[in-house]
Amino acid sequence: SVDFDSESPR
């Protein structure tokens, strides 16, 4: 929920 795609798998 922060950074660019930190909560994304890759």
Swiss-Prot record:
Give the residues annotated as coiled coil: none
**One Gene Ontology molecular-function label:** calcium channel regulator activity
One GO CC annotation: extracellular region
Where the protein is mainly located, per its record?
Answer: secreted
Q: Does the keyword Disulfide bond apply?
A: yes
State its role: Blocks contraction of smooth muscle elicited by high potassium-induced depolarization, but does not block caffeine-stimulated contraction. May target voltage-gated calcium channels on smooth muscle.
In the record, the note on similarity to other proteins reads: Belongs to the CRISP family.
Report what the protein is called: Cysteine-rich venom protein
Q: What is the lineage of its organism?
A: Eukaryota, Metazoa, Chordata, Craniata, Vertebrata
